[in-house]
Amino acid sequence: MKLLISLIAMTALSMSVHAAETAAPTTPAPAPPLKPVRFILVGDSTMANTSGYGDAFCARVNRANTCINLAKGGRSSGSFRAEGRWDEVQGLLRGAAAYRATYVLIQFGHNDQPGKPGRSTDLKTEFPVNMARYAQEVKALGGVPVLVTPLTRRSFTDKVLENNLQPWADVIRATAAAQKAPLLDLNAESYAAVQAMGEDEADTLAMAPRPDKVAEAAAASGKVEVAGAAKSAFDRTHLGAKGAAYFSHMVMDEVKREIPDIAGQFKPESEQ
């Protein structure tokens, strides 16, 4: 009798084990949604809204609310901080828990050049320090600094494009290397593109149509940028809608190339 009971118990146990082995596997819990990537743009009028490529760049990002354009016309690497504008960037970085990563694109140079009282910075002793400090502070707050060399101006002499921003671009290249930060060499790429298209085509990228007295107009409106939004007039520094679209696409392509991990953060070409 005891033997029979033991056999019955063993059979029941075997059937239970077999049933457990053949039962449908449990469905794993769904993975939490991936946090978005955020972009913050810091710079001067060539990046700012209405006069630069920044808003057009943000429009190419998958989620418009994850791209914040804080660039401001007339600002240099020194005055942007002196006015307290960098405080806003740091505040955003401190509140970055909702984002997988925050990339801060930093572009200065135009207003760091000599002849702009209250904004010009010394190329050797101030500008490199300012750019390095921006990069270091972004990293300290958990962000990713992306240094951008200044957008070229579009003034030609005897069919050759001038590049008086080259020294500032060189400093940014060196700073990016020293800080191990991604570099978008917009100066080199925009210079090559504008030189290739020539003066007439380059002038179509401006904020307003080229007037008959082009030399006087360009000199009057583009030589010294006041500390504010650029006026809607022809010059060879600022950008209209066509110029913003053109150079924002260039910057987007540079981001995809230099930071391939976030190449998927932009809309398909057909939707841009």
Where are these regions (language model features)?
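Positively charged n-region of N-terminal signal peptides that target proteins for export
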Residues: 1-4
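Bacterial N-terminal signal peptides
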Residues: 6-14
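A generic, residue-level signal for flexible/boundary positions that often mark functional hotspots
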Residues: 11, 41, 231-233
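Sec/Tat signal peptide C-region and signal peptidase I cleavage site
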Residues: 15-19
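Serine-esterase "nucleophile elbow" of acetyl-processing enzymes
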Residues: 20-79, 87-99, 104
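Alpha-helical cap/lid subdomain in secreted, periplasmic
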Residues: 88-271
